Amino acid sequence: IAGNANKYYSYREAWSRIRLAQENGFYLEAIAIQESIISDRIINYLCHKQGVALLSNNNHFLSFSELIIKWRSEFPNGLLSGSYSNLIDTVNEWRLSRNKVIHAIVKSKPGEQTQSIDLFLEQAKEAAKVGEAIAREVCNWSKKNIRK
């Protein structure tokens, strides 16, 4: 394994955990790992492209939405990749559905019921399935474009 062996092993473990999490109904774990993969690939691309570390003013990594905004600034006309007409928009749409799912298990407006567990699990399963496909495409895109 050339280059960063630890990164390779981390990714191998991440993909394995995504698979196992989905097989066992732990969709939030899969979604969290997918976000980590997508963020890492965006950070890697932007650091190579812009030549700087992507840290906020308080020396923390930028939020997922902030990363997407910076990524979009590199591709103002969109980003065709694989079967996605605009990969950046697709990632951002998934981010929104991910946020909804992450908070949906117990969060509700005061006085309103939370959604049913069955509906939550259905939405979480779908977000994990979609997130895996998107994370794979972001990885594929990153491999092709990081060297340019």
Protein language model features and the residues they cover:
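Charged alpha-helical initiation segments
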Residues: 1-28
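Generic recognition of short, well-ordered alpha-helical interface segments
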Residues: 13, 29-32, 59, 66
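Short alpha-helical segments used as structural interaction elements across diverse proteins
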Residues: 14, 38, 69, 92-97
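Short, hydrophobic/aromatic alpha-helical segments in well-folded domains
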Residues: 14-17, 33, 116
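Short, hydrophobic, well-ordered secondary-structure elements
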Residues: 19, 24-47
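Amphipathic alpha-helical interaction surfaces
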Residues: 40-48, 70, 97-100, 104-107
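Flexible secondary-structure boundary motifs
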Residues: 42-88, 136, 140
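Charge-enriched, short contiguous segments at helix-coil
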Residues: 78-148
